[in-house]
Amino acid sequence: MPIRYIDQLADLKDKKVFIRVDFNVPQDSKGNITEDTRITGALPTIRYAIEQGARVILASHLGRPKGEKNEKYSMVPAAKRLSELLGRKVKQASDCFGEEVTREIDAMKSGEVLMLENVRFYPGEEKNDPKFAQQLANGCQVYVNDAFAVSHRAHASVEAITRVIPTVVAGFLMRNEMTFFDKAMQNPVRPLVAILGGAKVSGKLEVLEKLMNKVDKVVIGGGMAFTFLKSMGYSVGASKVEDELLPTAKKIMDKARKKGIMFYLPVDCVVANAFEASATNFITTVQEIPEGWLALDIGPASATLFTETLRDAKTVIWNGPMGVFEMDAFARGTFAVAEAVASAFATTIIGGGDTDSAVRKAGVESKVSYISTGGGAFLELLEGKVLPGVKALDIKVKK
């Protein structure tokens, strides 16, 4: 669909430019930001708007305050961190709308930046309430969506607001996300390899269905692999399995076989006698998982097998860890795959969420082509869905 970007606008000087960013970043108990990738990702768009002389109004959510004001979820730490990164003052608004906020916006000078308070402090945000969108817009002349990670949500600051502000465009982060996704799924250099992990098959079912029409190889790891293994007749001990999806898992593998898609599952795993970091654990083949033990990581032979599948890959998409990587004892498989993806002579795209964290924890984030900022949004794109936040930018359907 045709989308305009912020650098295609002729003049931003002195205009009130509303930029929807995603500063939903992790913080420690004292409110210190522990990981600021989403803030740094929005810097190019914010800097561009500043350089063009716009009056920059930023909006984001943080956490799940359930439609009520809660200081724990204030945007103050994000504004402070952004100030440090930009090397200039970012003012924190008193709220996200209202008379005081209107005065704060009207008092802004060219090139100044104002951070609105958490848009989820009001139920109208998640209800996609047009009235709330009107209040948020506050006379802004240009709307910029640079929040890919929330673009699968039809929320007021993502969707309804685009019917209020006259000029609607996307930012540079959004352009990067869409460009790399198109490179991976619409026009991939082959072979195209998809690596899927995580706990549940149910969360990736639609993705798997879609991938069956796109990929050359599929690699399945993480907890979801054991639903597939059980569907093949393996005894998987106490490993978590979605029994209701066993027939579906079998159908997916049959479909892959008929289409000539290589389908890889773990051949060994690390099993433990409890879901605990200190649990007794050992490596075993998938045929010999003891009764009562649960698999919490792929084993070294599986890591080698999965690494081999990437040797001739030209495009790699990875979403979902290979094990419970948050626990050191069960992180080796995920880190081995992270190293393999980082070393591949291919366009490598990491699908946000836990996979993003795993790649950073493995220390290879600088060696992959692109790390998506969106977990759920990335998955919905893989499923072939049109994201509400992206559809709202389509210039063909704009008023």
From Swiss-Prot:
EC number: 2.7.2.3
Pfam families: PGK
List of residues binding ATP: 204, 326, 352-355
This protein's UniProt keywords: ATP-binding, Cytoplasm, Glycolysis, Kinase, Nucleotide-binding, Transferase
GO biological process: gluconeogenesis; glycolytic process
Keyword Nucleotide-binding: yes
Location in the cell: Cytoplasm
Pathway named in the protein's UniProt entry: Carbohydrate degradation; glycolysis; pyruvate from D-glyceraldehyde 3-phosphate: step 2/5
Swiss-Prot/TrEMBL catalytic activity: (2R)-3-phosphoglycerate + ATP = (2R)-3-phospho-glyceroyl phosphate + ADP
GO cellular component: cytosol
PROSITE patterns per the UniProt record, alphabetical: PGLYCERATE_KINASE
Binding site for substrate: 22-24, 38, 61-64, 120, 153
Cleavable signal peptide: none
Predominant location category: cytoplasm
CDD domains: Phosphoglycerate_kinase (cd00318)
GO terms for MF: ADP binding; ATP binding; phosphoglycerate kinase activity
UniProt xrefs under PANTHER family: PHOSPHOGLYCERATE KINASE, PHOSPHOGLYCERATE KINASE 1, CHLOROPLASTIC-RELATED
Subunit structure and binding partners: Monomer.
Family stated for the protein in its record: Belongs to the phosphoglycerate kinase family.
Protein name, entry field: Phosphoglycerate kinase
